[in-house]
Design a protein with these regions (language model features):
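Short coil/loop linkers at secondary-structure junctions
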Residues: 28-30, 88, 196
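Structural motif detector for alpha-helix initiation sites
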Residues: 19, 78, 147-148
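Short gly/ser-rich loop at a beta-strand->alpha-helix junction or flexible surface loop bordering the NTP-binding
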Residues: 38, 45-53, 63-122
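Hydrophobic/aromatic-lined pockets within catalytic cores
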Residues: 27, 86, 156-160
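Hydrophobic alpha-helical interaction segments
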Residues: 130-211
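Internal catalytic-core helix/loop-beta-alpha segment
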Residues: 112-138
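Short beta-edge/loop segments at beta->alpha junctions of small alpha/beta modules
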Residues: 1-73
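A general structural signal for short secondary-structure junctions and capping/turn motifs
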Residues: 35, 105-107, 141-143
C-alpha cells in the first residue's frame, strides 16, 4: 500500500498531478487510495484523474496554473486573460482558456473552467508564466495569451460582439487601448487569423477608440 507521506513528498512539487504521474512513482497506486485521501481532505480532486494538495490553493496563480494542466494543450485567454491584464474592469470567476481539444467545462473547488476550441493553425500567441512551487525550490509553468491574442480570441469566438454598441459593452480600458495596445502585434496576429468577419470587428473596435 502506498503511504501518504511518501506520496506527498514525490507529487507535491508538481503543483497538481494526474493519477498517471502518481503511478510513475508508485506503480501500485490504486484509485481507492486517492478516494480515501480525498475524503480525508488530504488531496482535492480537480477533474477526473487530476488532483492537488490543499496548501497549493493559497497561491495567487494556482487557479490559472491548473487551467493549463488539467486540459492540455491549452492556454488562458479570453475574459480571464483580459481581466488578468486589467483590460476589462470586472473580476472573472470562470477561468477561460483556448484549446485544440473539444470544448469542455469543468468545475472544482477553485471554480469553473471553460475551454473553447480553435483549430491548430490558430493555437499560438501565448507565453509561459512561471509559478514558484510551494517550497520555493522550483517553478511550474502555465500559459497565458498575449493581450492582443486574448482580444482577438474573444472577438473570434464570441460572435455576439459584432456591432459598435456590443463592442462598447466590453468596457475595455481606455489607457490600454490608446497607449499600451501593441498595434503592430495586433495587425500581425489579425493577418494570421485570415478572417474577414474578424477584420470587420477589429475595425469597428479601433474606430471606437479613434485608433
Amino acid at each position: 500500500m502506498v503511504g501518504y507521506t511518501e506520496f506527498r513528498e514525490k507529487l507535491h512539487p508538481f503543483g497538481c498531478f494526474s493519477i498517471y504521474q502518481g503511478r510513475s512513482f508508485f506503480p501500485e497506486l490504486g484509485r481507492n487510495s486517492l478516494v480515501r485521501w480525498t475524503k480525508r481532505g488530504l488531496i482535492i480532486r480537480l477533474r477526473q484523474g487530476w488532483y492537488a494538495f490543499p496548501d497549493m490553493f493559497s497561491k495567487t496563480d494556482f487557479s490559472r496554473f491548473v487551467a493549463s494542466r488539467i486540459y492540455a494543450p491549452s492556454y488562458v485567454s479570453l475574459h480571464t486573460a483580459l481581466s488578468f491584464y486589467g483590460i476589462i474592469p470586472e473580476a472573472v470567476t470562470q477561468i477561460t482558456s483556448v484549446t485544440t481539444l473539444k470544448t469542455a467545462l469543468f468545475e472544482n473547488a477553485l471554480g469553473q473552467y471553460s475551454y473553447k476550441t480553435v483549430k491548430s493553425r490558430l493555437f499560438w500567441g501565448y507565453k509561459p508564466v512561471e509559478m514558484t512551487s510551494a517550497d520555493g525550490s522550483a517553478s511550474q509553468t502555465w500559459f497565458l495569451a498575449h493581450p492582443e491574442k486574448a482580444l482577438l480570441d474573444l472577438l473570434y469566438l464570441y460572435p455576439f460582439y459584432n456591432s459598435e454598441d456590443e463592442l462598447m459593452q466590453l468596457r475595455l480600458d481606455e489607457v490600454f487601448m490608446t497607449e499600451e495596445l501593441n498595434r503592430e502585434r495586433l495587425q500581425e496576429y489579425l493577418l494570421r487569423f485570415n478572417n474577414k468577419v474578424l477584420n470587420g470587428r477589429v475595425k469597428k473596435l479601433l474606430k471606437i477608440y479613434e485608433l
